[in-house]
Amino acid sequence: MRTTRYCKCHFFNGESDHWGILDRTAFAQKGAKANFAPDTPILPKHLLLELNFDWEEEKVWGSTTYELLVYSNGVQEIKMDAANLEIDQVQVGSKRVSFENTGEKVIVFLPKPLKAGTAIKVKLNHSVSKPAAGIYFTKPDKEYPNRFKTVWTQGQDEDSKYYFPCFDQPNFKQTTEVKLHLPKGMFGLSNGRLLKKTSSASKSFYHYKLEIPYSTYLLSIVAGEFVEHKSKVGDIDIKWYVQKGREKEGRNSFKDTGKIMQFFSKYTGYAYPYKHYTQIAVPEFVFGGMENFTVTTQTDLTLHDDRARLDLDSNGLVAHEAAHMWFGDIVTAKDWSHAWLHESFATYFDALYTRESKGEEEFRYQLLEDAETYFSEDNRY
């Protein structure tokens, strides 16, 4: 994710107001507690998430089905993250089972203790109205009659639990399928490839699947009326989506995406592992950019018309989020105490693409700017 620039591990000869803080060991506030990855007696292998949406009530409801593998003997319960969700029913296999909903966790009680190596399937029916985080609705209203109607998610750090029960820590990875039931004519997007799309007199339906395991916070859902642009660079389909009428701005902002992906594949020696890379520019996306695996969400503020493009481009944001496909998505920190590595690598690779596209002087100037930005953090605490 990117809202501002982050640290890169480069230092420079010369004067700076901030060199005196190099002995600082952390920016942690007094009283901060140690953060550790959770125990893993059960690990998710596959997630099937099926959702419906009501814009008037700002309600999300549906079902979550997990295929799980037991890693410890004697497991009697499954604990999942579920913040302020209504849980209506839980099944293990075909049998309904009892559960406890604490408001932060849902604890599923198994019919009998399980042995290591056992595979089980758990399905939960759930709903939430006006979720506090994780998923956001926008729609026209009296004050803003032309406001864009959409819904979008933002999972980082641990906000997916606000709209479906899940294993909401970065060390848990699973393959996914996402099924979206939407109003007629509305476009739906999620991670991976589109398996099925149907439309009826009143509904649209989209079914996506991603076969590469990834962390829950990288799961994405966006729905609204968007226009697609598609091209091919090497073996990768490059796609981006914008609101109708902003296609030219989309080209201005995202036209170098294919070059960026090729450069990172070559530089890392590890080719981007999926068939496509998608970006979608979303109104009111206050998080800047979010590197959801295979399908990055970008703020529509990064879309530039021809006049604005004379003075700036979006390659910094595009490169930063694309770099996260390697550093954050494919390789992921075990827990959030190491998430700074995601951002540091992505910020550095953004600068590397600056050197590739604009030369050494621009590269070094960007490093200096980033170092100054990093050290200025000390003034905020």
Predicted regions and their residues:
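Acidic/His-enriched low-complexity segments
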Residues: 2-14, 19-275
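Hydrophobic alpha-helical and helix-loop surface patches within well-folded domains
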Residues: 208, 239-381
